[in-house]
Amino acid sequence: MNSLQPDLIIGGGDFVHGGFYDSGRVMDRRWKVADTFLKKLHTKVEPIIGNHDFYEPILQDRSPSPHDPRWRWKKYFGLHETYRSFSFRGYRFLMLDTVKVVGGANPYRGWIDAAQLSWLDRELRRIPPNQPIILCTHIPFRTSLRDSFGPFVGPSPGRVRVLNADSVLSRLKDRPLALVLQGHVHINERLQDNGIPFITGGAVCGKWWDGPNMGTWPGLGVIEIRPTVGGLAPFDERISWNYTNLPSTPAMPRISQVA
């Protein structure tokens, strides 16, 4: 990753594995592994929280825990909240928290809560109306995964997409939304909806360190953003994107090695 010499790294969530049913002791060890990797990066990482980054969110009876399961992630990255915004190269990045803990057999779902939507309303009042926006989300807003790989997804669509994504997109309908970056499902995918590109960026672990996942090899998305002046040009003129495969080597840790 350092050899690419990026100006910025968007960490799309799931910095560790497990989270929902693993003990805090196990998760602490996995965070140490993640810390070893992240400290080797030469470029600033702007993180998004993923469902595996949660810390003991579910009790033994599968009900939601009363404590804040996001505290470990927030402490590690030095952030007060799991959603925020920042500007880079003329673009405003909106970093969202798309995981809602619900417990039960499907312990989470893709959802933007009311507090975050209220924050977004306030944030949009602060952002200049002509500033192009890049939306970053762990769980996808748009994906074909359920149509293409139905047995993998099962009966719960909230496992693979944000169920109230339109509550966010409707707030941005009169804004220059340039791009939506997504993660979670470990596939390399680009969709377009109403002229907006939705890019799902694969995963550095592929199929959890076991080769490709549904045709997508371990890798990462490389995006080149060109400064914008006087509004948005067509997508392919202002932003270029490609998926870069990473070599799978014995040095990559398997889940059992950090359990």
Where does each model-flagged region fall?
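A short C-terminal boundary segment appended to hydrolase-like catalytic domains
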Residues: 221-259
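Active-site His/acidic residue clusters
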Residues: 141-155
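Histidine-centered catalytic micro-motifs
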Residues: 135-141, 178-188
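Short acidic, glycine-rich surface-loop motifs adjacent to enzyme active sites
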Residues: 16, 127-145
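Active-site glycine-centered loops adjacent to acidic/histidine catalytic or metal-binding residues
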Residues: 13-14, 50-51, 96, 138, ...
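N-terminal active-site segment of His-dependent metallophosphoesterases
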Residues: 1-27
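Extended active-site neighborhood of metal-dependent phosphoesterases/phosphodiesterases
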Residues: 21-132, 155-159, 163, 167-179, ...
